[in-house]
Amino acid sequence: LLAGDPYYCQCQKTARLVAERLGLQPEQWAVAFQSRFGGAEWLQPYASVLLAEWAKAGVKSVDVACPGFAADCLETLEEIALENRQVFLAAGGERYRYLPALNDDPAHIAALADLMSRHAAGWPEFAPGYDADALARERTATRQRALALGAAA
């Protein structure tokens, strides 16, 4: 990440946009990270740790989504849907619901096909309706949110 990997920021942005679309307040959602393995430290907070903390603090019900996954896989089905469910319930939670990825939903496939078609056809930046000023404003706002979350300037 310190070398410029945008993954963390992309996760934060996606989660924020989903939460806004759902009308959630900041205290109603969080971003956590999965798939720790090996000796290297991974992005935090870790999903299993956060879920256990929430359950111990009295949170009884959670819905868990992984918007970074276009389709479910071993990580989402085994680690997130099953193992993290066990962690949450063992720590005192009562209801854990994993919301599956979009997988082969027709609207999802159509959106992916449209996105790929636009990018395969050339530079989307030169397409009609492209607004460079709006993109610049969004990048500035994204940077301000990242700094507020503790990113280095």
Question: Language-model features: where?
Answer:
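Extended amphipathic ligand-handling, pore-lining, and cofactor/metal-binding catalytic surfaces
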Residues: 1-153
